[in-house]
Amino acid sequence: MTSQSFHCPACGAPLIPRGNAAVISCPHCHTSVIVPEELREESDAAQWTTLLFDNFASNDNNWLVGNHDSEYFSPLNQVIADGRYRWEAQVSRASSISTSWLGAYRVSDFHLTVNSKHILGSKAGSSWGVIFRVQDNRNYYYFHITDSQFFAVSVTKNGQWLNPIDWKRTDAIKPNGVNQLEVIARGTNLIFLINGQIVSEIDDDYYGQGVVGVAIEGYLSGEKIIFDFLDFTLRAPRGQE
């Protein structure tokens, strides 16, 4: 076992890794904390394999691209170029969402990491995030953030929205900067991280498996919004690939 320590991002207390555990509880503030991968025993890293790393140098993974007009966004232009997956949209109807997912990767347990930047639009007028355990366009989870430093986890079931985690504020979000979202799913346990900091954890059994992707949401009719997705990494337990 490693003797190295690291610090709790919530309270700053020193923490000691525990074997190959990916997540431990801080004994001082009781926050769930992800253990840096390099401090875990090798057996933990050996349990995972990278299914996909996409830095958007090309569209080899067949993401949704092109110009689209709908009652929700008009227009919506999605382009992969110069190492980014850019979404430019004019919101036609308030509280509209647009999604794109990878149908080739259906997983149950997984570790999903995505980096993105909000380029244009008001801080609270739109959000971006990751979708996971997607069944179809009416059934999936959505972990998303705003540049006003709020995040939420939503789930749509047959088109009806529920909020397992309602909007919460967190200083983990960097306004006007690149932000990283992570989801670690093991069975019904779902852990959510922003820029390496665990912001919430739930047990939820709406969907046990599905595909993964990204999404944007616009809340203000008439507003133009732009988001750049910079990379997309999906890992799964060995043997599940």
Name every feature range the model reports, one short phrase each.
Residues 8-11, 26-29:
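Short cysteine-rich clusters marking metal-coordination/redox-active sites
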Residues 74-96:
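Short carbohydrate-recognition loop motifs
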Residues 44-69, 230, 241:
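Extracellular carbohydrate-recognition regions
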Residues 56, 112-114, 176-186, 190-192:
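Short tryptophan-centered beta-strand motifs in secreted/extracellular beta-sheet-rich domains
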Residues 202-231:
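Flexible glycan-contacting loops in extracellular carbohydrate-active proteins
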Residues 90-156:
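Secretory/extracellular carbohydrate-interaction modules
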Residues 159-180:
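Short, aromatic/His-centered strand-loop micro-motif at the edge of beta-sheets
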Residues 30-40:
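Short Cys/His-rich micro-motifs in 6-15 aa windows
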